[in-house]
Each structure stands twice: as C-alpha cells, then as structure tokens.
Amino acid sequence: MGYIGAHGVAALHRYKYSGVDHSYLAKYVLQPFWTRFVKVFPLWMPPNMITLMGFMFLVTSSLLGYIYSPQLDSPPPRWVHFAHGLLLFLYQTFDAVDGKQARRTNSSSPLGELFDHGCDALACAFEAMAFGSTAMCGRDTFWFWVISAIPFYGATWEHYFTNTLILPVINGPTEGLALIFVSHFFTAIVGAEWWAQQLGQSIPLFSWVPFVNEIQTSRAVLYMMIAFAVIPTVAFNVTNVYKVVRSRNGSMVLALAMLYPFVVLLGGVLIWDYLSPINLIATYPHLVVLGTGLAFGFLVGRMILAHLCDEPKGLKTNMCMSLLYLPFALANALTARLNAGVPLVDELWVLLGYCIFTVSLYLHFATSVIHEITEALGIYCFRITRKEA
C-alpha cells in the first residue's frame, strides 16, 4: 500500500517549510547556544541522524524510568533524575540543531520535517514516562502524556491549515521542555518524595489556600499545566484555524472533524481502563502510554504527510487505522463485567497485543513513507549526497 499518490509527489517538489518562533528564551538564550553547538557536527553528518540521536536520548530516559520504577510510583535513585534532565536537555538541543545542520549542508527537505516532527510526536510519550518516574505519578503519567499530546496535535492541526508552524512567546518545545528538565535536576536534589507531598508542605506559600494546599504536588502541577498551558494553547490553535477557514469561506465543522480520531483514541483508552478489572493504566502505565503514544504518532504522521503532499482526501479515514484494535480491547474488557471479573483474554496479553499492533502500524508507515519520499526526491534519509538520476 502506497501512502503518496502522483499529486503528492509533485507537491513534495514544491513544498517549502515555514515556521515562526516568538519565544524570548529561544531568541536571546538558546538560539545563540544552538548556533554554536551545531558546529560540533561535521558537515557530512546528515540532519536526520542528529534527529534520531536526540530521540534515542528520550528512549534511554524512559528505559531508565522503567528499570527503577516499573509502575512509576516508587522513587528511583537520585542520579536517575539527573540523567533524565541531562537526556531531555540533549534531546531539546539535538532537535533544535537538526534544522540548522540541514541549512549548513544544503540538505533541507520535506522528509526532514516529517522525520523531525514524527520523532517529536513519539517523544511526548517517552518523556511522559521519564517524568512519571521522577514525580512518581503512577497512573497520572498517562494524563501528563495527554497534556503534552493535546497541544502537539493542536499545533499540527493548525500548521495543516495555516502552512506556518507558529510557536507563541511561551511554548512547549522551548519553555515547556526547559521547565521539565529543570524539574528533573531539582528532583535530583530534593528527592522524588517531594512530589508526593501535599502542595502546602512542598511549597509553603500555598499552605494558607484552602483545598489547594491538600492536593498532591504532582497532581497540582498537572492541574496548573492544564489551566495555564493547555487551554490557552488550544484556544490559540482554534483561533488561528478559524481565521484561515473563514478567509477561505470554508467549513469550521469540517476542520474540527480532523480532531475526532485523536478524541476517539483518547476516549477509547479511557473507556478500556474503566472497564478493565485490573486498573489498567495504574498497573501497566508504560505499556498504555507506549501503545497509545505510537497510535498518536501515526495520527500526527498522517496529518503531516497530507499537508506535505497536499492530499487531504481520505485523511480522516486513513488516520482511523490506528483505532482498529480498540474495539477488540473494549469487548474483551467488557467480558470481565459479564464473567465475574475474569476477561476472555488476560488483559496483559491484550495490552501487549495493542503495543505490537501500534508498533507494527507505525513502523510500516514510517519505513514506507521514508522510502517513497526518498525515491520521489532522489535523496537518502541518512546520507547527504543525492541519488544518481
């Protein structure tokens, strides 16, 4: 099955990336550092290799979290927190300089954008697992993934319509990641138990505030992120898309329909957890976040590809391929309600099947699209030289 049609191949040759970053932290602090840091890499180093190396830092971080806190509810050694912070900082740095390396080597391409943003989509899951071990979030780790996935999906959706990736003054890739790796370093000093305290104990400034002072610190951070980061960002995305759709006399309902695969994915997993007799997310947080994160990566990848290739036809239907496993999982969990709490198939095996399904689907998509784009543009994924005509 091919993912790119003849029209898409022609569109790839015309495509030009457009992005704007309004972050003051990036402009005055990080950009000068990144401009110098990119010179560490030799000119023969392909940008996609830098992207992949950065992504592997987060994979390593999540593995450390799993080894020392399998259910993300026990404190790992303090050096693990420091490692989480360092690996996230390196991921952010490598993710920022891959584009600079592409411009240095005159090797910018639509494949680079897809590869970069595709890794970023998966990074939401792997960093959520790493932070879950730092803050001992347990089942709340899934919600920390959700609050990173929603703005990412919203930004991708906005980019699809505006043709420009707009990062506001305070954004996730810059200030958000910086705040998280600082949190990792901070935890290496005070210990993971700090996050398990009530907010009034961990931050005495809030001790006088009724109700708020009794909330667990990690959960209070989750609520604050939703209120002050996720909701404003989503409102920003919707406003920008509405302006574009209105200027084109288009349908906002059809634009919003592109969000439903993600809503169904999120809702399906939550219903599965509700029906499951084993408290699914709390028992196997890594597997739930991994499987759902890969399904999310497929959704984002399909939307980015449709944008690059100007091929929106059938987009929503194709995106729903990542949802095909959920009806089976829900039906199996429902059998437990009808059979004295015992499902037809053990939930662990169903969850492992979910991860295998999403891994297979994503790998098929990624490898197929990389092959199709490299053939269409006459380039290599991990080499700077062009293919001979």
UniProtKB/Swiss-Prot annotation:
Disulfide bonds: none annotated. The keyword Transferase applies. It is a multi-pass membrane protein. The active site is at residue 117. CDP-choline binds at residues 48, 103. Mg(2+) 2 binds at residues 95, 116, 120. The chain crosses the membrane at residues 40-60, 141-161, 176-196, 221-241, 252-272, 280-300, 322-344, 350-370. GO terms for molecular function: diacylglycerol cholinephosphotransferase activity; ethanolaminephosphotransferase activity; metal ion binding. Mg(2+) 1 binds at residues 95, 98, 116. It is found in: Membrane. Coiled coil: none annotated. This is Choline/ethanolaminephosphotransferase 1. It comes from Arabidopsis thaliana (Mouse-ear cress).
